[in-house]
């Protein structure tokens, strides 16, 4: 399956650019949370209960959840995406699409009958429903009331609603994680907003019983001491979070201006990426790649390109120049 961020693949296709790559192919914050050197001590220790408890308390507080027992830490949300379908009996699963393709792949692999749908489905028709909110790649987000109603209906019939909130840190008030009770599992990514994807850290927020089942499936030491220490500190850094949301919003608007001037229509996105459409998008994809600008293309939607945010003025300048006719 195609994913952004694979610069070795980009180099194999385009060659190595003289000035290095400007990687705009992911939805990752280009200005990461600064890791204090003291936190690196976690490299020398096994994850102990105190570290894990501190991480879960920080996550529960950051996500508006009162009980840390409703939060499970994992080595990235991808691990949760892989494991969750195996915790439920095989049945009919609706995936709100188009979206992150690993959801459908994981549920199919676990033996579920996957149906890709374009709108929130009726709970009566499915045993599980999966949606990404805000969605990747177009940023759409069903209303919180609609999501809560569907979660209640799924819970009443013994089903589950999985809400992938990988980009929800951009607007904490829009998250449904605090509502995650029986029948609702919210997935929260750490690496995207905090700009530390290599740390491999993510969370599931749900009811305590389901949380215990997920934790048991993941086994002991699901995340490293390093990830626990850095995650706990970053999740508690409210001032950085507020400043970062402002910076990302400003730069997303700047990206809108650049893309519109280059003849794109903005399809949607979040403050970490923009999905844009142009008839000759594939031609421009090749042009940008030869200039060392790596963006995300979609073979099934050849008029679409997804752009992450440049992280420096040099990268903005290179993108602007590469966009010129």
Predicted regions and their residues:
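Conserved PLP-binding catalytic core of the aspartate aminotransferase-like
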Residues: 249, 259-291, 309
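PLP-dependent enzyme catalytic core of the Aspartate aminotransferase-like
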Residues: 143-145, 290, 300-325
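Short loop-beta-helix segment that forms the pyridoxal 5′-phosphate
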Residues: 60-83
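Conserved PLP-anchoring active-site segment centered on the Schiff-base-forming lysine
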Residues: 86-108, 113-115, 119-120
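Short, conserved charged micro-motifs
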Residues: 35, 122, 126, 280-287, ...
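PLP-dependent aminotransferase class I/II
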Residues: 184-260, 264-266
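N-terminal "arm"/small-domain region of PLP-dependent enzymes with the aminotransferase-like
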Residues: 1-51, 58
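Active-site phosphate-binding strand-loop segment of PLP-dependent enzymes
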Residues: 115-170
